Swiss-Prot record:
Its main location: cytoplasm. It is found in: Cytoplasm. Interacts with DDX4, PIWIL1, RANBP9 and TDRD1. ANK repeats lie at residues 45-74, 78-107, 110-144, 148-177, 181-210, 214-243. This is Ankyrin repeat, SAM and basic leucine zipper domain-containing protein 1. Plays a central role during spermatogenesis by repressing transposable elements and preventing their mobilization, which is essential for the germline integrity. Acts via the piRNA metabolic process, which mediates the repression of transposable elements during meiosis by forming complexes composed of piRNAs and Piwi proteins and governs the methylation and subsequent repression of transposons. Its association with pi-bodies suggests a participation in the primary piRNAs metabolic process.
Amino acid sequence: MASGALRGLAVAGGGESSDSEDDGWEIGYLDRVSQKLKGPLPGEEKSETFKKALTTGDISLVQELLDSGISVDSSFRYGWTPLMYAASIANVELVRVLLNRGANASFDKDKQTILITACSARGSEEQILKCVELLLSRNADPNIACRRLMTPIMYAARDGHPQVVALLVAHGAEVNAQDENGYTALTWAARQGHKNVVLKLLELGANKMLQTKDGKIPSEIAKRNKHLEIFNFLSLTLNPLEGNLKQLTKEETICKLLTTDSDKEKDHIFSSYTAFGDLEIFLHGLGLEHMTDLLKEKDITLRHLLTMRKDEFTKNGITSKDQEKILSALKELEVEEIKFGELPEVAKLEISGDEFLNFLLKLNKQCGHLITAVQNIITELPVNSHKIVLEWASPRNFTSVCEELVSNVEDLSEEVHKLKDLIQKLQNERENDPTHIPLMEEVSTWNSRILKRTAIAVCGFGFLLFICKLTVQRRYPNICF
């Protein structure tokens, strides 16, 4: 191969390893675009030449070798066919040529299908989409799973290809299929942080409540992997996207989800999907997509929207019905306010010890809640600023508030120490007061002990007297008592 060519090994798509490590698939491009055969080649040399033509994308040489009698479904050392290799690098023209020559689109190697290989290929979504469409047009089954029970739609979702996902569903792919770990396509998209795929799957009827084998739903998987925007979106109760395209026919779904680019090959369909921002995500979740243009015209950010008052809603042209949806969503997201008003009044001299103890216990519990809340926030905050997904004000504002919090906590600590010293002082004075009257509980306990001991003594004396009486009667039967 010419110097400077890129070299590498073609491996099975989707994480499936091949049965052999030394198959010698070279990925690269020769300096010469095309080669010509100079007469008949021996069988082994012909096979190597065919392999080289595939790796370099030499369509003319591939066609010439096929014309010379080499099988279109030739099996190389680790079992891959030419079509599987072409699909693994998303070479659309090579896939088309091989299919037109009769290559088997339903071939699999150890349950690794050509369609799975195409969905997990290295290449642009446009190329992958075209390859997948060609394979589906030759009746490749979109629901055959690999050894890990992963189907093509799961690989497409995992790798972030929303239009490939849509095309597979349009051809009958089961959107809620689960792999060996209970992951669905939606779970994979949430795990990898592919927002566009999550939205597309919800449109296609994906169930966001299906659990993995360890009991996690997609929103929890997103949270665990620090994809907080997806977590917040999936956590919303309202979801008008779900199932919007579920009842459409295959042709209607393809027409609605995919668009044809007239500037490129018109016989293929590929992606024209536009990414959503955090404001659009929030509005989509509430079924308020119609408000997007209105809010953008007025430069209203998500942060501003979430802090608006009722009069501001009306002033900005937001209807009462839409206001109710937004306020309802805010109630789901806001943290429950600490209700100190429920604590007992302690400023009264006649307060009982039980009431005062109850007050202290509630106060301690509220402090525990505050500590937990801060710990949760620390855990959820991204480590790096570029990972923040929502619009934030200046960090200086947050730092200033945190400084005030620290000051208030220090003041609280000082006051609690004063309270503790006062209670300790009162306790010491009471214990040293000679006029102190024991609590009724203490007196009752003491009296109970005296009565118990007296009763035992009387019973013991009576039993002893009874024994003595029996003994005397046996020895002196004539004596009467």
